[in-house]
């Protein structure tokens, strides 16, 4: 009799949970329509892979790219709609979140054609690779719209798990295995630290998990200036620091960049920073509203360390991917300036604008590295010497992307940095902006050093890798060059589109 009653209670509870989930999905599902498109694409990939042979490889690329493009289209149609909170307060849609989701989708859309030829040449498993890319993209999108502590923790874990698997995708490569191990260990440690910070925030607010409710809870409990909030701030900053990889949380970055497959590095180098920047902005600006001076100071220290250490160590690197790893550490220091400035003085708009240009500059550079690596099998900077004599198109494309990363006029990087530094100067961050200007000049040195190697025509300096260089016979059909051309164009002609981009970015307040 007791067992019968317990069984009935279990069935009733299960039915209630199912009906509640169905109700949420029915009424709130339209608010995550772009994410639903990606989920549908993932299901299609699995179905096609399990029911077909290798001849359907083009279909796998088509489905992946189409689902990403359709998701972007759905986001654009939803632009400028009223902000909405859905799924019992777990998810929020507004212009700020959607523009970061757009950037993540844009990164993934450009990274898939960047990976096609690489996967074919290295004979890696295709379906799983595309599944991990789409799932990581999905995790990043949910992170951008996360509105409570649980979702803010679960969404990046979804992204991180796929990142660990992607970084070790070439399992026979010792460097790839080493990179994955370091990435996994440091990722697990940072997640533990982040959860510990969340627990302090949860307790101090009286048991609230939604971001805005945490603020109300801190006011009600009078704990907004308590030591518990300071402890929470420190732990959360350290946890988020791993995702953003500023100094001194950057130790994993060079090894993962060097050991992982190059298309994976291209994907992780931009998507992780976009998603983490969106999350960091919301966490610092909403729950820690009353501790703005404290988190401003913490982020200023991280920005200064990142800009100085990243650019100084990049000068000494001999591997192109390690150089870009340290360069990315410096770049995130510039992005942090926008986070500190905030809504006032167009800080978020400058951060978003620079992030868009950084995506094109960085992915364009990695597209050139993927092409050169496939045709020569090397990643050493010295081996790029004389590339202009064999492939002027590739050499010029790489030079333009590097110059844009350095911030030379009239390229996109210059306009992005000028806007970012101007907003920082207007907000009174004089020392931070001066450090940014000096380190930008420093970065130009090591970028120009590489460009000088590319353009050299002296036979004694040209390496055997370039002497034996062979271009792809199917040049017009090379998907890597498609991504490269798109990124190079976006990195070099920003003047026409600069004002519309800034206008859109300014309309992203949350």
Swiss-Prot record:
One of its GO terms (cellular component) is chloroplast thylakoid membrane. Keywords: Chloroplast, Membrane, NAD, NADP, Plastid, Plastoquinone, Quinone, Thylakoid, Translocase, Transmembrane, Transmembrane helix, Transport. Its EC number is 7.1.1.-. One of its GO terms (biological process) is ATP synthesis coupled electron transport. It catalyses: a plastoquinone + NADH + (n+1) H(+)(in) = a plastoquinol + NAD(+) + n H(+)(out); a plastoquinone + NADPH + (n+1) H(+)(in) = a plastoquinol + NADP(+) + n H(+)(out). Its main location: plastid. It comes from the Eukaryota. It is a multi-pass membrane protein. InterPro entries: NADH-Q_OxRdtase_suN/2, ND/Mrp_TM, Ndh2_N. It holds the Pfam family Proton_antipo_M. The chain crosses the membrane at residues 24-44, 57-77, 99-119, 124-144, 149-169, 183-203, 227-247, 295-315, 323-343, 354-374, 395-415, 418-438, 484-504. It is found in: Plastid, Chloroplast thylakoid membrane. NDH is composed of at least 16 different subunits, 5 of which are encoded in the nucleus. NDH shuttles electrons from NAD(P)H:plastoquinone, via FMN and iron-sulfur (Fe-S) centers, to quinones in the photosynthetic chain and possibly in a chloroplast respiratory chain. The immediate electron acceptor for the enzyme in this species is believed to be plastoquinone. Couples the redox reaction to proton translocation, and thus conserves the redox energy in a proton gradient. PANTHER family: NADH DEHYDROGENASE. Belongs to the complex I subunit 2 family. This is NAD(P)H-quinone oxidoreductase subunit 2 A, chloroplastic. The lineage of its organism: Eukaryota, Viridiplantae, Streptophyta, Embryophyta, Tracheophyta.
């Amino acid at each position: 009799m007791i067992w019968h009653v317990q069984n009935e209670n279990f069935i009733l509870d299960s039915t209630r949970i199912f009906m509640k989930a169905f109700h949420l999905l029915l009424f709130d599902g339209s608010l995550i329509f772009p994410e639903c498109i990606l989920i549908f694409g993932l299901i299609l990939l699995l179905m096609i892979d399990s029911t077909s042979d290798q001849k359907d490889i083009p279909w796998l690329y088509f489905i992946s790219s189409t689902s990403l493009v359709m998701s972007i289209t759905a986001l654009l149609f939803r632009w400028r709609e009223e902000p909405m909170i859905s799924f019992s307060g777990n998810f929020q849609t507004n212009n700020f979140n959607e523009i970061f989701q757009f950037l993540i989708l844009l990164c993934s859309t450009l990274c898939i054609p960047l990976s096609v030829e690489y996967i074919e040449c290295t004979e890696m498993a295709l379906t799983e690779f595309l599944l991990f890319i789409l799932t990581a993209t999905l995790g990043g999108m949910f992170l951008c719209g996360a509105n409570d502590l649980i979702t803010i923790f679960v969404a990046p874990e979804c992204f991180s798990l796929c990142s660990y698997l992607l970084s070790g995708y070439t399992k026979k490569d010792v460097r790839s295995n080493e990179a994955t191990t370091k990435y996994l260990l440091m990722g697990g440690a940072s997640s533990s630290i982040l959860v510990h910070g969340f627990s302090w925030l949860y307790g101090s607010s009286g048991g609230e998990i939604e971001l805005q409710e945490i603020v109300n809870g801190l006011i009600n409990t009078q704990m907004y200036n308590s030591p518990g909030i300071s402890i929470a701030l420190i732990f959360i900053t350290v946890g988020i620091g791993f995702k953003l990889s500023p100094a001194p949380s950057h130790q994993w970055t060079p090894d993962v960049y060097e050991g992982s497959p190059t298309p994976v590095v291209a994907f992780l180098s931009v998507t992780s920073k976009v998603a983490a920047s969106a999350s960091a902005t919301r966490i610092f600006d909403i729950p820690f509203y009353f501790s703005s001076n404290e988190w401003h100071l913490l982020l200023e220290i991280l920005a200064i360390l990142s800009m100085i250490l990243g650019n100084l160590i990049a000068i000494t690197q001999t591997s192109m991917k390690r150089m870009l790893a340290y360069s990315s550490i410096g770049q995130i220091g510039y992005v942090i300036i926008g986070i500190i400035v905030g809504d006032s003085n167009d800080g978020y708009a400058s951060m978003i604008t620079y992030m868009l240009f950084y995506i094109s500059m960085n992915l364009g550079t990695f597209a050139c590295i993927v092409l050169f690596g496939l045709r020569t099998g090397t990643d050493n900077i010295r081996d790029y010497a004389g590339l202009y004599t064999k492939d002027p198109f590739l050499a010029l494309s790489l030079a333009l992307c590097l110059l844009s990363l350095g911030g030379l006029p009239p390229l996109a990087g210059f306009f992005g940095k000028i806007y970012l530094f101007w907003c920082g100067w207007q907000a009174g961050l004089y020392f931070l902006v001066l450090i940014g200007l000096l380190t930008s000049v420093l970065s130009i040195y090591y970028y120009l050093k590489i460009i000088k190697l590319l353009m050299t025509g002296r036979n004694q300096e040209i390496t055997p890798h370039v002497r034996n260089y062979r271009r792809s016979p199917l040049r017009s059909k090379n998907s890597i060059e498609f991504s490269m051309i798109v990124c190079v164009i976006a990195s070099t002609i920003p003047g026409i589109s600069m004002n519309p981009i800034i206008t859109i970015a300014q309309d992203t307040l949350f």
